[in-house]
Amino acid sequence: MRDYDEVTAFLGEWGPFQRLIFFLLSASIIPNGFNGMSIVFLAGTPEHRCLVPHTVNLSSAWRNHSIPLETKDGRQVPQKCRRYRLATIANFSELGLEPGRDVDLEQLEQESCLDGWEYDKDVFLSTIVTEWDLVCKDDWKAPLTTSLFFVGVLMGSFISGQLSDRFGRKNVLFLTMGMQTGFSFLQVFSVNFEMFTVLFVLVGMGQISNYVAAFVLGTEILSKSIRIIFATLGVCIFYAFGFMVLPLFAYFIRDWRMLLLALTVPGVLCGALWWFIPESPRWLISQGRIKEAEVIIRKAAKINGIVAPSTIFDPSELQDLNSTKPQLHHIYDLIRTRNIRVITIMSIILWLTISVGYFGLSLDTPNLHGDIYVNCFLLAAVEVPAYVLAWLLLQYLPRRYSISAALFLGGSVLLFMQLVPSELFYLSTALVMVGKFGITSAYSMVYVYTAELYPTVVRNMGVGVSSTASRLGSILSPYFVYLGAYDRFLPYILMGSLTILTAILTLFFPESFGVPLPDTIDQMLRVKGIKQWQIQSQTRMQKDGEESPTVLKSTAF
């Protein structure tokens, strides 16, 4: 009995067909990069202060002193959410009294921004913040928008796999690509914050579903050696490229509606890939559509300049994976023994912390010193060497040491930021870049590591639960950034501390480097780095009469 890889081995590893699929599927991820992070510019909060209407009769002196001052980073700056009571200062102005000389400003009554705000337009012409006044008492709405986008990502991650299993990888890929682009287009016509946010949730659902479908399609079409590079480098680097393109669009288009409209164009262009990307032959075979799968393989052979055998898929020889009797496993198996329970809990913590760090630093771009467009580009560009380093580390070094070192690097530089003098803001920005580099490397490696830790029978569930924890981390990340409004260093202190603690925790994971993938939960206990012993205890009073499980005792460093 031959499996799919053996049957299609005549196509070769890296011919023109494989290169075409590799680059086209990777290119389909580019819109994901800028759609996911576009909120950095769509919801940018410019400098603002209370609006003082021109209809109010104030002298120039009183108009210049109509906003109270506050101390921020050692400087006196106008308050953003308060002004002196206009009726009072208008009366003083009419009487000819001068602010500061005749009137003690500290004793004046204040009021909220009853007439709205005026916004600085040096960086943004308009954002959803300036359009719907998402500042002061409503400043929580901007991070909520981002969190709800990631809620959409979480929802999409639940349904994308089921949809692609039922309707095909290619159909779901282009359907969700259209969903992402279409709802982004509809956001342009949002009439209020609520409409924008609901549509953004749907964009998030389409974004992750598109990503998952492209990922699965590539891993099923490409050969064993190439699919590893595709999974660790291809989709990741093209995602980073999309992220790098975002500030270029935003620099030249500073109105949020026009920016959104421009960002939908690449998604529309990706629709042309329908005529070049085939359906997964593996999926077609699983559906009994062998003739269609054979047509695709023969076309691939023609592109590669190879003569295909007269019969490619012989139903009597092809190993049908669906014919094997499925074993029933449920989520309880992830906590059935002490060993797998400890690994599951630690994996959840690891994924959640990495996600908070990755998305927190990406979304924190507006709070960095310097040009927001340059900083955004650098935060995206630093991901490329991070992915390359992660791939090299996965090839040659133990997993837990590599991930722990990357996290320790990212966390330590974030903690060090609070010690940097305010005048050395370039150093602070450089430290954020290094932190993003370390956390991104860990993010890339943790996918492979988690899949290697879990046995075949529960691998999808294990990775799925961990990935869900990652989505929860991304939902929380905007509020880590939001804390920067109270203390500039607080987000970095929290993210840095969590990252370093997780780096230490990672050292207690079992090592999977160079070890065959476990197939059963019992085999999982024999992964290199775990010392085992059998708990000797009284016979359990259970109906199924199971033996006491082998548990995690210690980890050899």
From Swiss-Prot:
GO terms of biological process kind: (R)-carnitine transmembrane transport; (R)-carnitine transport; adult heart development; carnitine metabolic process; carnitine transmembrane transport; carnitine transport; establishment of localization in cell; locomotory behavior
One Gene Ontology term of the molecular function aspect: (R)-carnitine transmembrane transporter activity
Organism ancestry: Eukaryota, Metazoa, Chordata, Craniata, Vertebrata
Database matches in InterPro entries: MFS_dom, MFS_sugar_transport-like, MFS_trans_sf, Orgcat_transp/SVOP, S22A4/5, Sugar_transporter_CS
Protein name, entry field: Organic cation/carnitine transporter 2
Family recorded in the similarity comment: Belongs to the major facilitator (TC 2.A.1) superfamily. Organic cation transporter (TC 2.A.1.19) family.
Subcellular location: Apical cell membrane; Basal cell membrane; Cell membrane
Keyword Glycoprotein included in the entry's annotation: yes
Membrane topology designation: Multi-pass membrane protein
Quaternary context: Interacts with PDZK1.
Ranges in the topological domain labelled Cytoplasmic: 1-20, 164-172, 219-232, 279-341, 395-406, 452-462, 510-557
Modified residues (Phosphotyrosine): Y486
Organism: Mus musculus (Mouse)
Residues in the Extracellular compartment per record: 42-142, 194-197, 254-257, 363-373, 428-430, 484-488
Free-text tissue specificity from the UniProt record: Widely expressed. Expressed in kidney, liver and testis. Expressed at the brush border of the small, large intestine and colon (at protein level).
